[in-house]
Amino acid sequence: MIALIDYKAGNLNSVAKAFEKIGAINFIAKNPKDLQKADKLLLPGVGSFKEAMKNLKELGFIEALKEQVLVQKKPILGICLGMQLFLERGYEGGVCEGLGFIEGEVVKFEEDLNLKIPHMGWNELEILKQVPLYQGIDNKSDFYFVHSFYVKCKDEFVSAKAQYGHKFVASLQKDHIFATQFHPEKSQNLGLKLLENFIRL
């Protein structure tokens, strides 16, 4: 059973509908104790890094997530802002500490790239590692992105990249911690396939 963490940051309904399409049992976790009932966790999110961390703290999720993920070793998937929150720090609205599951930081796309920010729309993945999330998904497949910030971290955690002005991290894996900058729930059949792969872990 998958807990979708509700911390007032966005796209819960679309993620829940995607899981329903593939027959996956899920529920909305509105408080930290709810996480104990799940065997997998999902941290979605759209919006500001700083505001999201503030909400997680106020709702009591930060320590609960660290317990469930780092101690209990439950698999977790972070989507978009959810992925960014896994890093050590972000700079949106000033320097802000993240959850620290993965070493690295979250920075804004450079203004001098002459590109529209946010990066919005379909983009091709360069799959760098055959991790479980990409089982049955071909290299150069397209997924849907909406973001103004991107992750900088060690290559050892990067499972895919995409190109927007320069190459950026499209997905991460560190042991049982998985994350995508793109939105699988908005990426049609390939996105559903990725979510199925997460369920099967």
UniProtKB/Swiss-Prot annotation:
Its main location: cytoplasm. GO terms for molecular function: glutaminase activity; imidazoleglycerol-phosphate synthase activity; lyase activity. GO terms for biological process: L-histidine biosynthetic process. One of its GO terms (cellular component) is cytoplasm. It holds the Pfam family GATase. Keywords: Amino-acid biosynthesis, Cytoplasm, Glutamine amidotransferase, Histidine biosynthesis, Hydrolase, Lyase. Residues 1-201 form the Glutamine amidotransferase type-1 domain. Its EC number is 4.3.2.10, 3.5.1.2. It catalyses: 5-[(5-phospho-1-deoxy-D-ribulos-1-ylimino)methylamino]-1-(5-phospho-beta-D-ribosyl)imidazole-4-carboxamide + L-glutamine = D-erythro-1-(imidazol-4-yl)glycerol 3-phosphate + 5-amino-1-(5-phospho-beta-D-ribosyl)imidazole-4-carboxamide + L-glutamate + H(+); L-glutamine + H2O = L-glutamate + NH4(+). The keyword Magnesium does not apply. CDD domains: GATase1_IGP_Synthase. The active site is at C80 (nucleophile), H183, E185. The keyword Cytoplasm applies. Pathway: Amino-acid biosynthesis; L-histidine biosynthesis; L-histidine from 5-phospho-alpha-D-ribose 1-diphosphate: step 5/9. It is found in: Cytoplasm. Gene3D superfamilies: 3.40.50.880. It comes from the Bacteria. HAMAP family: HisH (MF_00278). Heterodimer of HisH and HisF. IGPS catalyzes the conversion of PRFAR and glutamine to IGP, AICAR and glutamate. The HisH subunit provides the glutamine amidotransferase activity that produces the ammonia necessary to HisF for the synthesis of IGP and AICAR. This is Imidazole glycerol phosphate synthase subunit HisH 1. It comes from Campylobacter jejuni (strain RM1221). The gene is hisH1.
